[in-house]
């Protein structure tokens, strides 16, 4: 939501059901689709998440991203640009046991132009937003000094992606020091 409360950003996909696959009630007409489904439906451009902008009154719906990449978690920056995460960088997460796409920080103008990658990190980054000083705050799956199953920790970076750093320092918490806090 913009600071003036007039415009919303969101990510949307058709969830693998094209118009030809839906019944009149909007439910999938293919009996293999649903809870019993053992495989992902085949990829199509319509099944990728894309970023949209719309006025709170429902007018002016505009798709801002396109292509074969998933674009998620859009949020406004104080300068009017949009920060989001995307698979556009390419690459795969390091230790998932199988190829899992990598999501990193990106930004673009409010009209979807001038898209830039903000991060070169080799792990997933999630939920970007802006703090009161205009810095981008996000969570990052980071393996430095902690196991693979630790919680994602908060990070901060400049709006142009410079100087990314952990907010609280990069340390592995000791469960002995705080037994009530379980991070696994």
Q: Which sequence ranges carry the predicted segments?
A:
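Residue position within the beta-strands of beta-propeller blades
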Residues: 7-16, 53, 63, 81-87, ...
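Hydrophobic, small-residue-rich alpha-helical packing segments that form membrane-like cores
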Residues: 79, 87-90, 105-110, 115, ...
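Multi-bladed beta-propeller domains
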Residues: 56-70, 109-123, 158-177
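Blade-loop segments of beta-propeller domains
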Residues: 1-12, 29-33, 60-70
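Conserved beta-propeller blade repeats
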Residues: 1-4, 70-82, 122-137, 171-184
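Short, conserved, GDST-rich strand-edge loop motifs in beta-rich repeat architectures
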Residues: 11-47, 84-101, 138-152
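Beta-propeller blade signature
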Residues: 30, 41-58, 99-112, 151-162
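WD40 beta-propeller repeat blades
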Residues: 132-133, 140-141, 148-151, 156-183
